[in-house]
């Protein structure tokens, strides 16, 4: 979307049954990319459980999360991120970056994800996967 010149990204979570930390870290990444271009990410209509998860990890402190209708003039495009769409190196880099994003927004997330990130780093080193290469998405 951002590559197409759109400065607004609206994500409706009303049909989302659950969130994992990688997804929430991806939201932080999308937010940062849009903010860098004076754009905006809106996340709307999360379930009570999803809202609690977003709040617990600090995502609601930086991402606009609320209940509201789709803004007029917006067109929806269904998107999905699936591990099968990535080679193993790209997927591991994506997961790592997502969790680093969560750590960057709330110091409590370092404790939550430190061991996971260390294990991920070890796995990447064992598989000789470059940690800083940009993933192709």
Where are these regions (language model features)?
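STAS-like cytosolic regulatory interaction modules
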Residues: 1-15, 32-137
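Ligand/cofactor pocket segment of small-molecule handling proteins
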Residues: 14-24
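A broad, low-specificity signal for short, low-complexity segments enriched in glycine/proline
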Residues: 2-4, 22-25
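Histidine-anchored nucleotide/phosphate-binding helix
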Residues: 27-31
């Amino acid at each position: 979307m951002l590559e197409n010149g759109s400065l607004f990204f609206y994500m409706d979570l009303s049909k989302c049954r659950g969130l994992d930390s990688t997804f929430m870290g991806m939201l932080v990444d999308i937010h940062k990319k849009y903010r860098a271009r004076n754009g905006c990410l809106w996340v709307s209509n999360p379930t009570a459980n999803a809202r609690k998860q977003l709040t617990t990890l600090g995502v609601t402190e930086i991402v606009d999360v609320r209940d509201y209708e789709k803004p007029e003039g917006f067109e929806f495009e269904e998107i999905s991120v699936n591990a099968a769409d990535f080679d193993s190196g790209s997927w591991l880099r994506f997961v790592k970056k997502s969790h680093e994003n969560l750590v960057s927004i709330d110091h409590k997330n370092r404790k939550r994800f430190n061991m996971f990130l260390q294990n991920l780093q070890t796995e990447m080193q064992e598989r000789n996967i470059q940690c800083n290469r940009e993933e192709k998405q």
